[in-house]
From Swiss-Prot:
Pfam families: PRA-CH. This is Phosphoribosyl-AMP cyclohydrolase. The lineage of its organism: Bacteria, Pseudomonadati, Chlorobiota, Chlorobiia, Chlorobiales. The keyword Electron transport does not apply. One of its GO terms (cellular component) is cytoplasm. It is an enzyme of class 3 (hydrolase). Mg(2+) binds at residues 84, 86, 88. It comes from Pelodictyon phaeoclathratiforme (strain DSM 5477 / BU-1). Keywords: Amino-acid biosynthesis, Cytoplasm, Histidine biosynthesis, Hydrolase, Magnesium, Metal-binding, Zinc. Belongs to the PRA-CH family. The keyword Hydrolase applies.
Length: 137
């Protein structure tokens, strides 16, 4: 039998943010079940995602909110947000426009280990990142 002790709490009260105020969010294509990416959310990005039904994350490298698709056009429409049994990981089920990965692939998990312990590409390249974000200097 499942543990229903948190069922009286609101969704936001159930989320256990870490000491930096973040919670990991796994992002999955709602139609295919394919895992697209993992990102971090803080309370503000989670509230924005819940309000707008568009994925918003917290960028640790830029130290600011990141509305997915803001610069690339590759947005994520959020259909469901699930929380794990411990309350410390979220699962977003989304409809992905274009590629989810900033290097141009449909999924950030576009490489797999071979038996020889090398890597091979196992996903579809959706766009050229230089065309979308410009060349890195």
């Amino acid at each position: 039998m499942g543990d229903n002790q948190d069922m009286g709490k609101s969704f936001l009260e159930t989320v256990k943010f870490d000491d930096r105020g973040l919670v990991p969010a796994i992002v999955q294509d709602q139609e295919t079940g394919k895992v697209l990416m993992m990102a971090w959310m803080n309370l503000e990005s989670l509230q924005m995602t819940l309000d707008k039904k568009r994925a918003c994350y917290w960028s640790r490298s830029r130290n600011k909110l990141w509305l997915k698709g803001e610069s690339s056009g590759n947005m994520q429409v959020v259909h469901d947000i699930l929380i794990d049994c411990d309350g410390d990981t979220l699962l977003l089920k989304v409809s992905q426009t274009g590629g989810a990965c900033h290097v141009g692939y449909h999924s950030c998990f576009y490489r797999k280990a071979t038996e020889a312990l090398s890597m091979e590409i196992c996903d579809t390249l959706m766009f050229n990142p230089e065309d979308v974000y410009g060349k890195k200097s």
